[in-house]
Swiss-Prot record:
Protein's UniProt name: Guanine nucleotide-binding protein G(T) subunit gamma-T1
Assembly notes: G proteins are composed of 3 units, alpha, beta and gamma.
GO molecular function: G-protein beta-subunit binding; GTPase activity
Membrane protein topology class: Lipid-anchor
Family, per entry: Belongs to the G protein gamma family.
Lipid-bearing positions (S-farnesyl cysteine): C71
Subcellular location: Cell membrane
Free-text function comment from the UniProt entry: Guanine nucleotide-binding proteins (G proteins) are involved as a modulator or transducer in various transmembrane signaling systems. The beta and gamma chains are required for the GTPase activity, for replacement of GDP by GTP, and for G protein-effector interaction.
Residues carrying Cysteine methyl ester: C71
Domain of life: Eukaryota
GO biological process, one term: eye photoreceptor cell development
GO cellular-component term (any): heterotrimeric G-protein complex
PANTHER family per the UniProt record, alphabetical: GUANINE NUCLEOTIDE-BINDING PROTEIN GAMMA SUBUNIT
Amino acid sequence: MPVINIEDLTEKDKLKMEVDQLKKEVTLERMMVSKCCEEVRDYIEERSGEDPLVKGIPEDKNPFKELKGGCVIS
């Protein structure tokens, strides 16, 4: 898809592009923000038991755990 420089377009072309965009947007299904927030909250709460950021990572499976001991170079 080619890039369009808006400054190079006539006023008529700009308005036509705006109308085309609005035609696309009018067909989108919209939901109330309060309903979306409820669904997102419920989704997060349902999966919080599996979330390693909430639950934590078991020490034996933590790939970032500092290794004990060291390396001796001789």
